[in-house]
Amino acid sequence: MHCPFCNAADSKVIDSRLAAEGCQIRRRRECVSCGERFTTFESYEVVMPRVIKSNGKNEPFDEAKLRRSLMHALQKRPVTQEQIETVLSDIQLQIRRLGERDVKSRTIGEIVMQSLFALDHVAYVRFASVYQDFQDVEAFRRQIEQMQQREH
């Protein structure tokens, strides 16, 4: 770690503590050259897998796109912002736990559907109607029947 005072390349760690609810490490350092002390914060970087679209294209995971999809499905539903954030984090965790560099968009869609099913059935059907490209009322009916069978 370069010293912010003299730009020397070497410093020693005097103290380390967890910060930001355990998501960061706060380190107190001392420059070996000039003796000045400074603080650094270290945090981990979460790398999400790339998404393989149904057309075969490969693109980076887009948290904003996932958030928009959830918000659209949950629009005007009795769900708090905290619940939405929890579901969003849970979905991303499930995707990371797959341990793959590339994940099919279909797999992500299935994870989202499972999460919405547990959270709000109306949002689940809304998402399913777009995700599975419902073409008529009968498709809605079949989805609702499947949902009711899962509950019993």
UniProtKB/Swiss-Prot annotation:
<keyword id="KW-0862">Zinc</keyword>
<keyword id="KW-0805">Transcription regulation</keyword>
<keyword id="KW-0479">Metal-binding</keyword>
<keyword id="KW-0863">Zinc-finger</keyword>
<dbReference type="InterPro" id="IPR005144">
    <property type="entry name" value="ATP-cone_dom"/>
</dbReference>
<dbReference type="InterPro" id="IPR055173">
    <property type="entry name" value="NrdR-like_N"/>
</dbReference>
<dbReference type="Pfam" id="PF22811">
    <property type="entry name" value="Zn_ribbon_NrdR"/>
</dbReference>
<dbReference type="GO" id="GO:0005524">
    <property type="term" value="F:ATP binding"/>
</dbReference>
<keyword id="KW-0547">Nucleotide-binding</keyword>
<dbReference type="GO" id="GO:0008270">
    <property type="term" value="F:zinc ion binding"/>
</dbReference>
<dbReference type="GO" id="GO:0003677">
    <property type="term" value="F:DNA binding"/>
</dbReference>
<dbReference type="GO" id="GO:0045892">
    <property type="term" value="P:negative regulation of DNA-templated transcription"/>
</dbReference>
<comment type="function">
    <text>Negatively regulates transcription of bacterial ribonucleotide reductase nrd genes and operons by binding to NrdR-boxes.</text>
</comment>
<comment type="similarity">
    <text>Belongs to the NrdR family.</text>
</comment>
<keyword id="KW-0678">Repressor</keyword>
<protein>
    <recommendedName>
        <fullName>Transcriptional repressor NrdR</fullName>
    </recommendedName>
</protein>
<keyword id="KW-0067">ATP-binding</keyword>
<keyword id="KW-0238">DNA-binding</keyword>
<dbReference type="Pfam" id="PF03477">
    <property type="entry name" value="ATP-cone"/>
</dbReference>
<feature type="domain" description="ATP-cone">
    <location>
        <begin position="49"/>
        <end position="139"/>
    </location>
</feature>
<dbReference type="InterPro" id="IPR003796">
    <property type="entry name" value="RNR_NrdR-like"/>
</dbReference>
<keyword id="KW-0804">Transcription</keyword>
<feature type="zinc finger region">
    <location>
        <begin position="3"/>
        <end position="34"/>
    </location>
</feature>
